[in-house]
């Protein structure tokens, strides 16, 4: 059970960190264009 939780956390971080990074870049570009 603990291994599954750790794997879930690792997968969530692996997905969320690049997504957040791309989202921040997108917001910065959008605000610069407007």
Swiss-Prot record:
Q: What is its main location?
A: plastid
Return the SUPFAM superfamilies for the record.
Photosystem II reaction center protein M, PsbM
Q: Which topology term describes how it sits in the membrane?
A: Single-pass membrane protein
Task: State which residue ranges cross the membrane.
Answer: 5-25
Q: Does the keyword Transferase apply?
A: no
Q: Spell out the HAMAP family in the cross-references.
A: PSII_PsbM (MF_00438)
Q: Briefly state the protein's biological role.
A: One of the components of the core complex of photosystem II (PSII). PSII is a light-driven water:plastoquinone oxidoreductase that uses light energy to abstract electrons from H(2)O, generating O(2) and a proton gradient subsequently used for ATP formation. It consists of a core antenna complex that captures photons, and an electron transfer chain that converts photonic excitation into a charge separation. This subunit is found at the monomer-monomer interface.
Protein name, UniProt field: Photosystem II reaction center protein M
Q: Which organism is it from?
A: Marchantia polymorpha (Common liverwort)
